[in-house]
Amino acid sequence: MPSLSAYKSDLDYSYAPGIFPSMECLMHRPEKTRRVLIHSSAAGREGTDRLRTLADKAGVRVEEADRVLARISGKENCYAAAVFEKFKDEPDPEKPHVVLHNPGDSGNVGTILRTALGLGIEDVALIRPCVDLFDPKTVRASMGSLFQLRVKVYDRFQDYREAFPDRALYPFMLDASVPLQEAVKTRPEKWTLIFGNEGKGLPKEFASMGQAVRIESNEKVDSLNLGIAAGIGIYQFMMHEA
């Protein structure tokens, strides 16, 4: 087997650090899983036996690789990692979408992926410049949810819009916005929630592309964390009865 490098964006593979993310990779993308790395001290830890069983079932090689795990995770307490081939998906045109415009934090993106999956959204788009979807930090923050989602990265928002021209857009921003509780009442069958960069938010032109939405809060805070705002928005739109 070829040696493994510390993660770089130009590699054709990446890592899913952690026992649970590794299991998610094996369960939902077994054809993309190249091998599984396990720490010598992982024996007896919750999930280790199941991870080995899943690897055996998928015909994936399991290796003991303490040094490699420390190198790719940057931590000494990483007990497993799946090595997987990067993949491409297309969002389902009939399903609800979430678009993240220029997100800059891997932890936020991973959290949003996990939240989206948990609330029933399986289609996500990222607009460049943005975090690396396959960075192990993103994969780990998603707790492996990435492997159950259809995620595509676009160079421009216009590219996404041209691919899905018949969708109602809901950019989360203050300009020309209505409260979230009002926006969900007119939710059509096909819709997309759009969230901006952690620091800059969405450019002003997004207000004219759809119905701008705001999450109302009291005056004691000036804004909400991107992951929290996305979670609130996704929850309200998914739980509202059309």
Residue ranges and their predicted role:
Residues 79-89:
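Short, structured interface segments
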Residues 23, 28, 82, 117-119, ...:
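Structured adenosyl-cofactor binding patch, chiefly the S-adenosyl-L-methionine
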Residues 171-222:
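Active-site/ligand-binding-proximal alpha/beta "capping" segment
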Residues 31, 38, 89-176:
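RNA substrate-binding interface of SAM-dependent RNA methyltransferases
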Residues 18, 104-112, 223-229:
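Amphipathic alpha-helical repeat scaffolds
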Residues 65-66, 101, 127-128, 150, ...:
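Short beta->alpha connector loops at strand-helix junctions that form conserved
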Residues 16, 61-66, 149-159, 213:
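Short acidic-hydrophobic, aromatic-tinged amphipathic segments that line or gate anion-handling sites
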Residues 1-81:
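N-terminal positively charged helical leader segments and presequences
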